[in-house]
């Protein structure tokens, strides 16, 4: 739903695009985070009603990340199916200079996902051992170490 007549509906820019591009509603200046402790709000002028069982994920366009020092303040935005407010992006400028986002500029993408229902069940015994074990951030590094919970006395 357009909240402003100037809003541009999200659009898949190519036939195989996974995300829908989001457009900036107004020309917006994003101050360097060196000079501001608050994120800048980028308005889209849009609101939506997702079907029950779905959510939207907001991510920066890769070209925005490549060409600027702008980042989403929360790294990724999540829009729940029961949210009815404006779709907004909270942006930080990690660079040294002011960044201008022009009206109508594509800055982020919205991906729509189906929620998979899961049931969380507390383990009452132990978890199975795997080749990776408990090594965090170790895949492909060939540490050769395998730690189990028994070895850690957890």
Residue ranges and their predicted role:
Residues 1-154:
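DUTPase catalytic domain/fold
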């Amino acid at each position: 739903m357009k909240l402003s007549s100037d809003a541009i509906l999200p659009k898949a820019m190519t036939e195989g695009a996974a995300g829908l591009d989001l457009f900036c509603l107004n020309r917006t200046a994003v101050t360097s985070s060196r000079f501001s402790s608050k994120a800048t709000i980028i308005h889209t002028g849009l609101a939506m009603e997702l079907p029950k069982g779905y959510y939207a994920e907001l991510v920066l366009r890769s070209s925005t990340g490549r060409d600027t020092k702008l980042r989403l303040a929360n790294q990724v935005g999540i829009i729940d199916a029961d949210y009815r407010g404006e779709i907004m992006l909270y942006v930080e400028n990690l660079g040294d200079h002011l960044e201008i986002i022009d009206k109508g500029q594509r800055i982020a993408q919205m991906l729509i996902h189906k929620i998979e229902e899961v049931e969380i069940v507390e383990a009452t015994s132990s978890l199975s051992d795997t080749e990776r074990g408990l090594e965090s951030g170790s895949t492909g590094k060939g540490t050769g170490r395998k730690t189990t919970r028994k070895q850690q006395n957890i």
